[in-house]
Amino acid sequence: MSAKADMKAGQTTRKSPRSRPSAATKTLSHNLNGQRLGRKGRDTRDRILAATNELLAGPADVELSLSAVARQASLGMTSLYNYFNDLTELLLAVLEPVMATAEEEYVGLLRTRWDDASLGEHSLALVTAYHGFWVKNSRLLHLRNRMADAQNERMMLHRINAALPVMRLMVEQMDGDLSKPQSPVFSMATALMTGLERIVTVTTDTTLQNALHAPNPLGRTHLLRAEARLLELGIRDYRMLAASGD
């Protein structure tokens, strides 16, 4: 996460210019050549997505590429390119059903105002749920973030757009004004979300943990509790500021 998230709050996603229609716009009715998808075409597309998920669930040292997906799906590259322009587009299609579960998995926990007396419990519940979401989808989400860190614009936008609902709900929990995305409370939400994402990134990165010789479940628990405490303090502090009119 970065200052871009602050700037994106309350704005619509900018469309990326493409030479061909994206898979997202042609998902159910046409392939990328404009041909209407029949049952066979839909089955082929589903095979590609299933093959991608199989590779993501496999050994972490196996590189994920379009050619690897084509082999896994027993398809030629020409057939695969009928459905996806590139690896980014394919991964965005895989991410779509995953992110559709975000509301039930963790976002919904923020929609009801948290009582002051139980801020700590609610904060820990959110951090734990978000961590659980990452555990379920770790390799895919790590891959998205690595691509975003490498300045892949579509993955950067996906990462920001995935965080925005949580950030805006954090602003509401802090009694902030959603119409003022440049306000300090939005910056606090950005900082809290950045910390939350970083904590779950570190605690679900087995390569990093092995490199640090620290695959310690208790250590992960301490980190999650520390992040929950920061979230609690941030919300409590800004509620007090809002109540005092500052």
Predicted regions and their residues:
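C-terminal peripheral helix-coil segments that are non-catalytic and often amphipathic
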Residues: 1-31, 168-176, 190, 194-246
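N-terminal positioning helix adjacent to the helix-turn-helix/winged-helix DNA-binding module
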Residues: 37, 44-51, 188
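Helix-turn-helix
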Residues: 47, 51, 55-89, 93
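Short hydrophobic clusters on alpha-helical segments that form packing/core surfaces
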Residues: 48-56, 98, 102, 130
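Alpha-helical DNA-contacting segments of helix-turn-helix folds
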Residues: 56, 91-98, 144, 148, ...
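Short, hydrophobic secondary-structure boundary micro-motifs
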Residues: 65, 141-145, 156-157, 212, ...
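Hydrophobic alpha-helical connector segments
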Residues: 89, 93, 107-136, 185-193, ...
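Amphipathic alpha-helical packing segments from all-alpha helical-bundle domains
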Residues: 103-108, 132-136, 142-145, 152-178, ...
